[in-house]
Amino acid sequence: MTDQSQQFASDNYSGICPEAWAAMEKANHGHERAYGDDQWTARAADHFRKLFETDCEVFFAFNGTAANSLALSSLCQSYHSVICSETAHVETDECGAPEFFSNGSKLLTARSEGGKLTPASIREVALKRQDIHYPKPRVVTITQATEVGSVYRPDELKAISATCKELGLNLHMDGARFSNACAFLGCTPAELTWKAGIDVLCFGGTKNGMAVGEAILFFNRKLAEDFDYRCKQAGQLASKMRFLSAPWVGLLEDGAWLRHAAHANHCAQLLSSLVADIPGVELMFPVEANGVFLQMSEPALEALRNKGWRFYTFIGSGGARFMCSWDTEEARVRELAADIRAVMSA
């Protein structure tokens, strides 16, 4: 029998993966130094440097909103602006936190294509106005994978980076589902970040088997100056930091981070294939990560809810998002697909 609690509303619904749980259990033995001066935090940072093939600065925060907001605040001043997609999480789902932590840096939205920014859309916003009365663009933030499940290719990232360098803009990546992007493309983390010109990455673990704790990686180490103070001031310096960092050791040391992401991606592909031939169901975006976006009638969506399924519909009338997780059961995917077929034929 399948786990009936498994839902597709969010990959945050899932629990803690065995590797992260085991690492936390090991970290719970004995005493360790506080505030990040412990062996687990050092080991996690070293694992990141090895994985990304570079001597980056590594920090940890409790969640993605804090990670993104503090990272962006370190890249600009209050009179600057941050260019993002109109669907970016920092714009739509972080309750003004980027503006709050930067003391007022304004978010400027740019047109996206399939959820992705382009050099042209960045240039359009960055050069729209250059007078003293307008917040000066200083940062571009992109999401990998995007909020609609699309994935930036290395060449796309390099083109965006080149535009940023030309215009004097720092480049930040919201990597809440960075693992899923790596799994989809088969690229190394380095190829999708600093080798493509990314200055700072917020690497998400919560959506990939961790309980809490995102990593902030500064590839441009100059931008990390006093970042530890920002974390402390914002309440993001965990006193028992080892319980944020140890799960990363569990995920990174034997490749669990990539295996779990690949499984979630596979389940999304499975769902997409199972509903592809259902009349009245339309795939809104290509399935490249762990999300499936379907266009269905409102009565059909309501019928699905009445069957006990949970999902989000924030992407427009008739649009529904179904997210797969590191532990999603294929049988549960098939149950969802069968119910979608049933409500569409009713």
UniProtKB/Swiss-Prot annotation:
The modification N6-(pyridoxal phosphate)lysine is found at residue 207. Its EC number is 4.1.2.48. Its cofactor is pyridoxal 5'-phosphate. Keywords: Lyase, Pyridoxal phosphate. One of its GO terms (molecular function) is L-allo-threonine aldolase activity. Homotetramer. Catalyzes the cleavage of L-allo-threonine and L-threonine to glycine and acetaldehyde. Can also act on L-erythro-phenylserine, L-threo-phenylserine, L-beta-3,4-methylenedioxyphenylserine and L-beta-3,4-dihydroxyphenylserine. Belongs to the threonine aldolase family. This is Low specificity L-threonine aldolase. It comes from Pseudomonas sp. (strain NCIMB 10558).
